[in-house]
Amino acid sequence: MDTKLQLRTYRRWDGLTADAVALLTSPREDPLAIPLLVSPSTAHARAVGQAVAVEVGVAAGLQGRTASALRRELSQSLLDMDPQVDPWSGSALTLRIFDLLRPDDPDMAAVSEHVQTCRVRGIAHADWTTAQQFSAVLQSLIRHSPAVLEQWRAGEDVDAEGSALPWDKTWWPHVWRLLHDDGHPDPMTQLTQLCSALGAAPLRWPSCVWISPAAPEWQDYSLAQALS
């Protein structure tokens, strides 16, 4: 893959599309090697593909991928990870959290008190609801504040501003650390491993066009850098 990273910003979609088409249809040593197109959505990729077809008559083999889909594809091929099994998202993460909410764990005092209060009030399944809510919190932190999670892993139980967590949230870092006991590398570790593997692996794409919003997520930025 061409290792020259060029960053371009656009205010208009037509200007972006014109440049993307020029890059995707430029001459290459192996005409059968299809460039990689990464876009925010399948709709964006389809629009670029249609523009390529208008320019050269056909867009055969050009299949756009979102950044998350590319991460899954590369993780499967380079790290042998099953893209259908993600212990750090959805119901899988909720279930793992639920299994850790033990009433005899002193670090779970806030959760135990909440669940007991709900039972007295006749509210069922408060522990499962709590697991669902914390699963959503973790997935948001993974996307937007991975540094906080790294601090928790290191034993620094603080919020995004570096302040101590309130009592009702002191169990959050405890559960985050417990989630690592089953050996599943967290998303930050997975991405580090993937980026390292990319540095040593031959890739089938001769070049890459990566269309990103103005403020890409950190995972997307790191992967784009690793591909450059």
What spans do the regions from the language model cover?
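Conserved RecA-like ASCE P-loop NTPase motor core of nucleic-acid helicases/translocases
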Residues: P31-H44, C208-P213
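An N-terminal domain-cap segment
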Residues: L23, E29-L32
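Short, flexible loop segments at the rims of nucleotide/cofactor-binding pockets, characterized by
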Residues: T9-G15, G183-P187, S212-A214
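Catalytic-core regions built around general acid/base machinery
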Residues: L223-L227
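A generic structural signal for alpha->beta connector loops
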Residues: K4, I34, V58-G61
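Basic/charged alpha-beta structural segments of nucleotide/phosphate-handling enzymes
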Residues: S39-L203, A215-W218, S228
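Well-ordered alpha-helical segments embedded in enzymatic catalytic cores
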Residues: L16-D19, Q190-L194, S222
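N- or domain-start disorder-to-order transition segments that initiate the globular core
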Residues: M1-L24
